[in-house]
Amino acid sequence: MTESVLDYMTRLGRAAREASRVIGRASTAQKNRALQAAAAALDAARDALTAANEQDLANGRKNGLEPALLDRLALTPARIDGMITGLRQVASLPDPVGAIRDMSYRPSGIQVGKMRVPLGVIGIIYESRPNVTIDAASLCLKSGNATILRGGSEAIHSNRAIATCIQRGLAEAGLPPAVVQVVETTDREAVGALISMPEYVDVIVPRGGRGLIERISRDARVPVIKHLDGICHIFVDEHADLDKAWRVAFNAKTYRYGICGAMETLLVDQRVAERFLPEMARRFQEKGVELRGCERTRAIIDSKPASEDDWHTEYLDAILSIRIVDGLEQAIEHINHYGSHHTDSIITEHQGQARRFMAEVDSASVMLNTPTCFADGFEYGLGAEIGISTDKLHARGPVGLEGLTCEKYVVIGDGQLRGQEPC
């Protein structure tokens, strides 16, 4: 009898739960050994990885996959090198598991503190890029979690080949292969099953388009770590150093158009707009960035008219909306109304303005004189990230190793009894 999708996913979930107990108590040395061995296995399997990836690329071309998606799908020699380097970098990161902090004596004589522990089983749902398989698996492994990886159907052969290398590394370190499992069915019912198994899965991390993340957030029966959009702003304050503002805003938009930390809306204080915007527009237009401005903006520079929808849009492209605001208060109101609570930055030399902006803007990262594209786990010193969260519970901002753990209380006594004074 053919195994149903639900039965298959239940089997994966049960195996992951059992494996999570093993990896959760594994030593740092054992986890690092698995990561280093997985890196060596990837290096030795370059031909097999390339062959599997060519199969996915051929299927993608046959199915009319867009060139940009085919590019994301490709495992070039440089990307394989990057995956190997990534595994070794994660192995070199400090292990958060088991760290105890804030131990203090209470009046009763007991000591109370907190210990960092793994979350358990993490489900990762993602699209296209097979290198995410390595990123997610390595971070989950190092943080003591088991993981179930459900990649896009277009990358199924690549993901299987990568998972085989990771499981070789686990075996070499004496850890169960179920610590990292790839969902090998392309049936979409697998996603519904994965997000509906709280008895086996502790948290879901979706990485993909807005539609995927909205569906998972709506239907999941387990907690979700996510962000929907990266509608990031830079506000050029009346007290800004304009040379600095030109450089920072240009970098925030043009560093990479397709990342979630790219600036999508530029807000400019009316008091500096006539001095700031012409040069800013010249730089963007030379780069080929399409500008869409409010009425006051279009009175100063040549741009297309911005609509209400533009303020809500994550372009992920060479398009920028520009609005002139009356001042700091209106800039904060705009960001909190139209933004996605991801990353927003103020350009100013006035510390009072900066403090108010950073206190009142409701985003996971708030910045001063810094391009929003710095919103990244490596740039924040986390070493690597599994994604960026705009939620307020558990993790917020770039989610690295520590974000894949939680804390439990540790209480140490010496026979104290409640209700009795300590001796």
From Swiss-Prot:
<dbReference type="InterPro" id="IPR016163">
    <property type="entry name" value="Ald_DH_C"/>
</dbReference>
<protein>
    <recommendedName>
        <fullName>Gamma-glutamyl phosphate reductase</fullName>
        <ecNumber>1.2.1.41</ecNumber>
    </recommendedName>
</protein>
<keyword id="KW-0963">Cytoplasm</keyword>
<dbReference type="InterPro" id="IPR020593">
    <property type="entry name" value="G-glutamylP_reductase_CS"/>
</dbReference>
<keyword id="KW-0028">Amino-acid biosynthesis</keyword>
<comment type="function">
    <text>Catalyzes the NADPH-dependent reduction of L-glutamate 5-phosphate into L-glutamate 5-semialdehyde and phosphate. The product spontaneously undergoes cyclization to form 1-pyrroline-5-carboxylate.</text>
</comment>
<comment type="pathway">
    <text>Amino-acid biosynthesis; L-proline biosynthesis; L-glutamate 5-semialdehyde from L-glutamate: step 2/2.</text>
</comment>
<dbReference type="InterPro" id="IPR012134">
    <property type="entry name" value="Glu-5-SA_DH"/>
</dbReference>
<dbReference type="Pfam" id="PF00171">
    <property type="entry name" value="Aldedh"/>
</dbReference>
<keyword id="KW-0641">Proline biosynthesis</keyword>
<dbReference type="GO" id="GO:0055129">
    <property type="term" value="P:L-proline biosynthetic process"/>
</dbReference>
<dbReference type="InterPro" id="IPR016161">
    <property type="entry name" value="Ald_DH/histidinol_DH"/>
</dbReference>
<keyword id="KW-0560">Oxidoreductase</keyword>
<dbReference type="InterPro" id="IPR016162">
    <property type="entry name" value="Ald_DH_N"/>
</dbReference>
<keyword id="KW-0521">NADP</keyword>
<dbReference type="GO" id="GO:0005737">
    <property type="term" value="C:cytoplasm"/>
</dbReference>
<dbReference type="InterPro" id="IPR015590">
    <property type="entry name" value="Aldehyde_DH_dom"/>
</dbReference>
<comment type="similarity">
    <text>Belongs to the gamma-glutamyl phosphate reductase family.</text>
</comment>
<dbReference type="InterPro" id="IPR000965">
    <property type="entry name" value="GPR_dom"/>
</dbReference>
<dbReference type="GO" id="GO:0004350">
    <property type="term" value="F:glutamate-5-semialdehyde dehydrogenase activity"/>
</dbReference>
<dbReference type="GO" id="GO:0050661">
    <property type="term" value="F:NADP binding"/>
</dbReference>
